[in-house]
Amino acid sequence: FVPYNPPRPGQSKPFPSFPGHGPFNPKIQWPYPLPNPGH
């Protein structure tokens, strides 16, 4: 299960985040085969 942050202004899609680690950065790591919302 991956919690999601609500979309922020200027951000069309929510980014997954992990507790204690802040926003997940798909440009650094994308551990599962899903479309990359950062692109």
Curated annotation (Swiss-Prot):
Query: What's in the keyword line of the UniProt record?
Result: Antibiotic, Antimicrobial, Immunity, Innate immunity, Secreted
List the GO terms this entry assigns under cellular component, sorted alphabetically: extracellular region
What is an example of a Pfam family matching this protein? Antimicrobial_5
Q: Which GO terms describe its biological process?
A: defense response to bacterium; hemolymph coagulation
Induction (record text):
By bacterial infection.
Spell out the subcellular localization from the entry: Secreted
In this chain, the stretch annotated as Disordered covers 1-39
Which InterPro entries does this UniProt record tie to the protein? Answer: Abaecin_antimicrobial_peptide (IPR012524)
Q: What does this protein do?
A: Antibacterial peptide against Gram-positive and Gram-negative bacteria.
* UniProt protein name: Abaecin
